[in-house]
Amino acid sequence: TRVGVAGTGSYGAGLSRALNAAGLTVVEVARQDRQARRRRGKSDPLDAHQAAVAVLAGTDTAIPKSGDGAVESMRILLAERRSAAKARAQVMNQIHALLITAPELVRQAFRALSGQRLVNTLARTRPGSEASADPAVVARQTLRRFAVRQLTMQAEIDLIEQQLDLLVRQVNPTLLSLSGVGPVTAATLLVAAGDNPDRLGSRASFAALAGVAPIPASSGQRTRHRLSRGGNRHANAALHRIVLLRIRHREPRTMAYFERRRAEQLTDRDIMRCLKRHVANEVYAALLNPAADNPAGRELRAHRQAIGIPISVLAASLGVPYQRLRRLEIGTRADPELERRATIALDAISPPQTA
């Protein structure tokens, strides 16, 4: 049974997870054509009917993210990290702005410092009494509080990146083995694909998702393509960072391709776009072959088979989709909570061992 749900990445996320847990196939319903909506009108019953028609007709076939595993945890952490990074940049701008307008004695004391040295020095200062009305004292107090705030944001970012590193190594260590891919970049790409990357049917679909698939813009005898402005822009930025790092570190394959395409009269910008597409192909292969090191999943499978319980029966008793439990058992997914629940369920039905 297929069910069409609109907004599976926002208001429909909870409904989508519940339907997946019930064993139903969820299909993402795209936004209706505006011209057709103006002609038919707008209401909840009409929208529901149109969604059902789209699913039955097969015009909407996109499978949404399952949002029920470690990759969903990465999405939450990345959102927190972006917020902390924005706050860190904002407070640095406030420090520089205050130093520009502060009294000369304050400006002179910190003029030779910049960057993290400036922040560390400001955080160690003792600005004086809080009851003072002297602008120089108040400026020092404010600068110290700004510096402490910046250090707090940096500590939060470091902690988040440690968590992301652990999660990525559990879910897909293959991504980290690619040149130019770190924990944050890997997590960004994993979040773009979701907990169920097999929903992306081809390399081209992942390239379109990441906004690196060129859009045909030919006319007559002129053949050309234009840049895609759509797709997941976080994933697009992650691919861009990978290419920049490979060029910066003179990665042999990248530089050989760069020089060959430059000899073909392509601009550096066009070559960057081509390289991003090649990197997207590498990432897609890694997403489908994660080689996750999850021996606990294999042990769970051996335990289940020793008891003689079919995987479909165990999945139904746990209230989870069969595919989710299967990915855990074959080692392509890390899911400590599901692993714990499955172990408890198997232990409860295991026959007592006789001496």
Residue ranges and their predicted role:
Residues 1-11:
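Short glycine-rich phosphate-binding loop at a beta-alpha junction
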Residues 17-20, 26-65, 72, 76, ...:
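Short alpha-helix plus adjacent loop in nuclease-associated cores
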Residues 77-174:
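Glycine-rich, often acidic, oxyanion-interacting loops/wings at catalytic, nucleic-acid
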Residues 176, 207, 304, 315:
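The alpha-helix within a helix-turn-helix
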Residues 177, 183-264, 268, 343-355:
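Phosphate-backbone recognition surface of nucleic-acid-processing proteins
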Residues 190, 318, 325, 329, ...:
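DNA major-groove recognition helix of helix-turn-helix
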Residues 288-306:
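A short, Lys/Arg-rich alpha-helix, primarily the initiator
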Residues 308-326:
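Short alpha-helical DNA-recognition segment
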